[in-house]
Design a protein with these regions (language model features):
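ATP/NTP phosphate-donor binding region
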Residues: 1-86
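A glycine/threonine-rich phosphate-anchoring loop and its flanking beta-alpha core
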Residues: 107-195, 203
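A short, small-residue-rich loop immediately preceding and capping a beta-strand
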Residues: 79-122
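Active-site segments that bind and position negatively charged phosphate/pyrophosphate groups
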Residues: 190-222
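Short, hinge-like loop/turn segments at secondary-structure boundaries
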Residues: 48, 76-78, 105-106, 134-138
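Predominant activation on well-ordered alpha-helical scaffold segments within soluble catalytic domains
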Residues: 22, 47, 58, 73-76, ...
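Short glycine/serine/threonine-rich phosphate/pyrophosphate-binding segments
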Residues: 15, 39-42, 69, 94-101, ...
Length: 222
């Protein structure tokens, strides 16, 4: 049986890895996040970092849980006005899915393709920063639509543990169990192969060894 393994996202990991975002060479960066990320200052800090590297920035902070068609449309309208050469998703799965869907549709509309897309996750568990999927909700029809396209895969992901150090212990535990579940699902998948097994086994082992420590002490960077 033929299989394939593709990982096209450039992943930056470790403390201070977010600082590498300055080297993306962006001139106009469009930051997508939820209201809390702007209120707590995370979005502003990211914007300042990009400004220091010579980029103009705009923050779209209207992301909601289970992102809706309406929110995606608003994000696209903001892109039309700002004309970014890069989109930065800051937050959890909802922010990343909003950025993926909006960026892809914006690129299709302008005829020039999607701008560079980078993900800066502030929680673990979804893995949306490296997948070709996005889920968007239709509030009127009370339905969810799963989008799948290779163009939805972010170009870069910044996994900086400093962004998760202040997450409440209960959230750390919940998202850690998400990681464990995804690892187990991948391992028993009918489409599993040697490459995916290696990733799944490592994920399971890391959760087993370190989740409790992370829950007890969010500042433990190991």
């Amino acid at each position: 049986m033929m299989g394939q393994f593709l990982m096209s996202t450039r992943i930056y990991t470790g403390e201070a890895s977010l600082e590498e975002i300055e080297h993306l060479g962006l001139k106009r960066a469009y930051i997508i996040c939820d209201p809390f990320m702007e209120k707590c200052g995370r979005a502003g800090e990211l914007a300042a970092m990009l400004n220091g590297a010579g980029a103009e920035t705009r923050i779209f902070s209207e992301v909601v849980p289970d992102p809706s068609i309406e929110v995606v449309a608003k994000a696209i309208q903001g892109m039309k006005e700002f004309e970014p050469d890069g989109i930065i998703a800051l937050g959890g799965g909802s922010a990343i899915d909003t950025a993926k869907a909006a960026g892809h549709l914006y690129g299709s509309m302008n005829g020039e393709g999607r701008p560079l897309l980078a993900a800066v996750p502030t929680t673990s568990g979804t893995g949306s920063e490296v997948t070709s999927f996005a889920v968007i909700s239709d509030t009127k029809a009370q339905a969810k639509y799963a989008l799948r396209d290779q163009a939805l895969v972010p170009d870069a992901a910044f996994l900086d543990p400093r962004l998760t150090s202040s997450v409440p212990p209960a959230i750390t535990a919940d998202t850690g169990m998400d990681v464990l579940t995804h690892g187990l699902e991948a391992y028993v998948s009918a489409k599993a192969d040697d490459f995916t097994d290696a990733c799944a086994e490592k994920a399971i082992r890391l959760v087993w060894e370190y989740l409790e420590r992370a829950v007890l002490d969010g500042s433990d960077m190991e």
